[in-house]
Amino acid sequence: MTTVSSDRIRIKLKAYDYRILDKAVAEIVDTARNTGAGVAGPIPLPTNIHKFTVNRSVHVDKKSREQFEMRIHKRLMDILEPTQQTVDALGKLSLPAGVDVEIKL
């Protein structure tokens, strides 16, 4: 078994919808375990909530406002002792649209 130079691969995933984020995490975990690497996580990180308040009307009624929010869900996971086969399989993996992936070796 040839291992990659580092001891782990750290993967940070972000998405607006937690359901597609969990599907992406499940695919990564299955791929890593099928190639013989260990997996630590997924660790749910705090959700960022961006709130926007706007006036409902254009000119009057300052008291009438509407609030919108944007939630960014995040997960962190480590692939422990990855092999070259693990790195190749993760590179070929197609994840759902809307998932932002950051990989650190």
UniProtKB/Swiss-Prot annotation:
One of its GO terms (biological process) is translation. PROSITE patterns: RIBOSOMAL_S10. The gene is rpsJ. This is Small ribosomal subunit protein uS10. Part of the 30S ribosomal subunit. InterPro entries: Ribosomal_uS10, Ribosomal_uS10_CS, Ribosomal_uS10_dom, Ribosomal_uS10_dom_sf. One of its GO terms (molecular function) is structural constituent of ribosome. Involved in the binding of tRNA to the ribosomes. Keywords: Ribonucleoprotein, Ribosomal protein. Belongs to the universal ribosomal protein uS10 family. It comes from the Bacteria. GO terms for cellular component: ribonucleoprotein complex; ribosome. It comes from Oleidesulfovibrio alaskensis (strain ATCC BAA-1058 / DSM 17464 / G20). The keyword Ribosomal protein applies.
